[in-house]
Amino acid sequence: MTEQEICVRVTRAAAKRKASTAMGIDGDRVNKKRVVLGELLNVSNVNLLANLNQKKETQKPKRNLKPPPAKQIKSAPVAIIDLESKSDIDSRSDDPQMCGPYVADIYEYLRQLEVKPKQRPLPDYIEKVQKDVTPSMRGVLVDWLVEVAEEYKLGSETLYLTVSHIDRFLSLKTVNKQKLQLVGVSAMLIASKYEEISPPKVDDFCYITDNTFSKQDVVKMEADILLALQFELGRPTINTFMRRFTRVAQDDFKVPHLQLEPLCCYLSELSILDYKTVKFVPSLLAASAVFLARFIIRPKQHPWNQMLEEYTKYKAADLQVCVGIIHDLYLSRRGGALQAVREKYKHHKFQCVATMPVSPELPVTFWEDVTI
């Protein structure tokens, strides 16, 4: 594939500007929209060009992962945090999938699973394994996959699994930079089959790359990834822990804060853009997102407390490095050219959390042991 053949990045907003002239170009694809990967050979100069078509895809059925509203329960004053029974918060949920009586054992198992060597990528695989791939290229790829996931209405769990498959595969196999996009769409195909009710077809993933790769290319790479990962696809992700951590984080608010959960999701998706976060396990990334989200919402209060420490198993000091990286991502001091996640969370359906202000500095007192 020559440099001229490598397609340039197209965003949803740019595609809309060309929609009126593009409808008649390809009759068979009139309802599709390509989201084209940025230039990997020169990641510092990503041009924005309009795409051929604007897609109006029929919405696919979604699983309702959101629990029904919790019933009103009389409790002690908010300032008093009861640590006597760790099952209290879990037992309040009306969602039977939370498995209140067994949740502590379940999460203990998930913590053991997330640190297994087969489940973890190498923290420095780009330096040790890859010869042609850079951290910036990985960032461009993940940012583009966020757009693809939005285009095909894929869940965040699918996105996290996709990135996990990519990092694990690149920890084992050397890949030419011209094949990096192929690794990305094939990993997303695998994750979609694992997670989604109606996953996109192989043709859809070929089309989203502007037919840079054939069906045979995608299927062959899919097989290569599955063999390299030894078909071990299920693993805990950030979402696995975030569901529980956000419920604990809401406990000391007088009323549930509407922006807390989408803000945690935004910070979590920002975190996967940066190669430096590969070394962190999902539970630590989730806890760091909760820590920073609480700081953004209530900047004058300490974002951590004994209950969060008890449920997450992390002290504030354990989160310092990870929180610092995500904080820099939030302020665009890292990965500022990667805009897909930022644009996604500016929408009203996510409470416009990407526009919330935050202090440029984190107080050093945050990393001391909490006694509240």
UniProtKB/Swiss-Prot annotation:
Coiled coil: none annotated. Signal peptide: none annotated. It comes from the Eukaryota. Keywords: Cell cycle, Cell division, Cyclin. It holds the Pfam family Cyclin_N. InterPro entries: Cyclin (IPR039361), Cyclin-like_dom (IPR013763), Cyclin-like_sf (IPR036915), Cyclin_A/B-like (IPR046965), Cyclin_C-dom (IPR004367), Cyclin_N (IPR006671). SUPFAM superfamilies: Cyclin-like. SMART domains: CYCLIN (SM00385), Cyclin_C (SM01332). GO terms for molecular function: cyclin-dependent protein serine/threonine kinase regulator activity. One of its GO terms (cellular component) is nucleus. Residues 53-73 are annotated as: Disordered. The keyword Amino-acid biosynthesis does not apply. The keyword Transcription regulation does not apply. One of its GO terms (biological process) is cell division. Belongs to the cyclin family. Cyclin AB subfamily. This is Cyclin-A3-2.
